[in-house]
Amino acid sequence: MGGPDPDVPDLDVPDPALLRQGYRAGRLEPEHLAPTWVEQFAAWFIDAATPGVGVPEANAAVFATASAAGRPSARTVLLKGFDQRGFVIYTNYASRKGREATENPFGSLVFPWYALERQVVVIGSIERVSRAETERYFQSRPHGSQLGAWASHQSTIIESRTVLDDRAAELAARWPEGTRVPTPEFWGGLRIVPDTVEFWQGRADRLHDRLRYRRVSVPADGGGTDSLAVADPDATGVRVGDAGGGDAGGGVPTAAEDLWVVERLAP
C-alpha cells in the first residue's frame, strides 16, 4: 500500500522453494542390509561417526513425543547407548519430554546424517532404564554436566540466565571438583524400544531408497502363520530373532523372540 514497512529489516532471505540438493552418495538395496536392525544401525553409525565425513555429532537425533492429548513436541537429544533392546537417552524426568514419555509412552527418533545423505527413523514405545544403568551413566559424566543436571529444572520458565548461573555456583560450592555428585532422583534414562527402524538413503530425482525393519508380533506358542499374514506383500525379507540380535536364520520363535520383516517403502 505505501511501500515496505520501515520497521521490518530488509533481509536478503533465500527462497526455500528454490533450495535443492541432488543426492548421489549411494544406494541401498535389501542385499546391503545386515541381518538385524541393530547391526545395520551400528554399521551406519560407524560411518557417521568417522572423523572427516562431515557429520558433527553422529549421536544427535530429533526426539519426538506427544502429550496425552496428542499435542506433539520435538527436540534434539544425544544418543547415549543402543543395543538389541533399543536406543537410550538421558533427561530430567520432570521436563516436557520426560512427562510426555510417562503420559503417552510412544515416540520417534530421527538421526539426520545429512553429509552422508542418510537418515534413520525409529518409531516405538518408551520405557525408563533401570536405576543401576542411570547411576552408572551419571557417574561417567563430566563434573560440570553432573552439576548441570541438578541446576536446571528443565522446561520450567526462569526469569534470566542469572538464575542458572547462581544455582550452578551454589552447587559447585556444595560439590567441588573431585567430590562425588549424587544422581538426582528426578533424572534418568529413557529407552526407545523400536517397533520400526527405517534406513533412508538419498537418491537422484527424489526416488530415494527406504528400507524398514518392522517388528511383527508372534504368539508365544510359535504359531507364526497368522502374524506373517499381516506382513505387507512387498516385504523383501524376514528376520527371526530377538529384538535385533537373535537367530537370523529361521526356526520357531520362542516367547522371548520377535519376528521382523524388512520392507521397501515408496519415497
Swiss-Prot record:
NCBIfam families: pdxH, PRK05679.1. This is Pyridoxine/pyridoxamine 5'-phosphate oxidase. It holds the Pfam family PNP_phzG_C. Substrate binds at R20, Q21, G22, Y23, K80, Y137, R141, S145, R206, L207, H208. Its cofactor is FMN. One of its GO terms (biological process) is pyridoxine biosynthetic process. The gene is pdxH. It comes from Frankia casuarinae (strain DSM 45818 / CECT 9043 / HFP020203 / CcI3). Belongs to the pyridoxamine 5'-phosphate oxidase family. FMN binds at residues 75-80, 90-91, 96-97, 119, 154-155, 200, 210. Binds 1 FMN per subunit. Keywords: Flavoprotein, FMN, Oxidoreductase, Pyridoxine biosynthesis.
